[in-house]
Amino acid sequence: MTESVLDYMTRLGHAAREASRVLARTSTAQKNRALEAAAAALDDAREALAAANAQDLAAGRAGGLDEAMLDRLALTPARIDEMIEGLRQVARLPDPVGEIRDMRYMPSGIQVGKMRVPLGVIGIVYESRPNVTIDAASLCLKSGNATILRGGSEAIHSNQAIARCIRLGLAEAGLPAAAVQVVETTDRAAVGALIGMPEFVDVIVPRGGKGLIERISREAKVPVIKHLDGICHVYIDSAADLDKAIRVADNAKTQRFAPCNTMETLLVHAAIAARALPPLGEIYRAKGVELRGCPRSRELLGPGTLEASEEDWSSEYNAPILSVRVVDSLDEAIAHINRYGSHHTDAIVTESFTDARRFLAEVDSSSVMVNASTRFADGFEYGLGAEIGISTDKLHARGPVGLEGLTSEKYVVFGDGHVRG
């Protein structure tokens, strides 16, 4: 790491810590004013955003980025519209900061409760998608946190243009510019510095490929909110309603292939497999899904079904590929999910209350569903509004991380001159 990068990141960290103290006492109205003003600045800066993004796209093509990466990098007019609306949606969300709950009188006469407060300074490390700059900045600002955003080098010009709009919004509301800072160096040493400053940064949220997240999880000296994989399952129970099962299993895989809450493995109880798998096989093939199965599922899914390897059961495809396995019991299904899954989202289709309760209790995932598609694992669908990501960890935030997940609780105590005897 060069001294200059370390000095630069230290300056950002110090400024963010100071800004976080201002944000902790900032009113909801003032935060909303900053978000609305940033939205207006984005709207006014469409041409500048397009020009900056064109620079990144040209550099990406010259550097050999594939079409999928270029698509994620592109700031189309529709995506700029989405960013503007995203800022306004966050402004409309309830502010969790300052909420006091569970107030109760203790035998001593004091009142004890919990107050929701910001985490402080949040570092965001992400790749490719410039819209993450807006998503992360808006959620951190509304939850009273200062943020340092380190986007991918391939999006540097786009991120800087977006940052200028955010700074205009902050200035309009009278908030410090350091409340939202975008790292303006492409030197990779900046990431190492950001994740190694516990005196300035309270939590890191990585958004990107598995390699990035594994590196940050391994090297960070501050807590990390993350998920590594989205290996999601649907289990069709012996007591499933067949129509519901087919509908859920179809949607969980084919509504979209790339998201982290898309089903990657379908488990089917042997008692219903002969009725469920043939029609599902037809549906999947019609939608271009490659099927990989165990011996029993291959017989029922028909010609063209490939043999599933051991590696398939623990693979996140993010593609039109599905692993299928026939199991003999609910116990076997739960054991498979807990062994091969990523603790993200898993669903059971069943009419048995007993089986549903067992599945909910024993599957060790951040979201567990009954008779619903895994695609519902989403902050908007859960009523959280926007989300900064999904956490599969068990401490602090778990599942979709919205505004409340970017805060913590502290105990507050009220007395009237009370002393402990």
From Swiss-Prot:
The UniProt entry, under InterPro entries, shows: Ald_DH/histidinol_DH, Ald_DH_C, Ald_DH_N, Aldehyde_DH_dom, G-glutamylP_reductase_CS, Glu-5-SA_DH, GPR_dom
- GO CC list: cytoplasm
Name the top EC class. oxidoreductase
- Annotated disulfide bonds: none
Answer yes or no on keyword Glycoprotein: no
Localization, per the record, is:
Cytoplasm
Which Pfam families does this UniProt record tie to the protein?
Aldedh
Q: Which reaction does it catalyse?
A: L-glutamate 5-semialdehyde + phosphate + NADP(+) = L-glutamyl 5-phosphate + NADPH + H(+)
Chief subcellular location equals cytoplasm
The UniProt record lists the EC number as 1.2.1.41
Tell me one GO molecular function of this protein: glutamate-5-semialdehyde dehydrogenase activity
Keyword annotations from UniProtKB, A to Z: Amino-acid biosynthesis, Cytoplasm, NADP, Oxidoreductase, Proline biosynthesis
| Family the entry assigns | Belongs to the gamma-glutamyl phosphate reductase family.
**Role of this protein:** Catalyzes the NADPH-dependent reduction of L-glutamate 5-phosphate into L-glutamate 5-semialdehyde and phosphate. The product spontaneously undergoes cyclization to form 1-pyrroline-5-carboxylate.
This protein's name: Gamma-glutamyl phosphate reductase
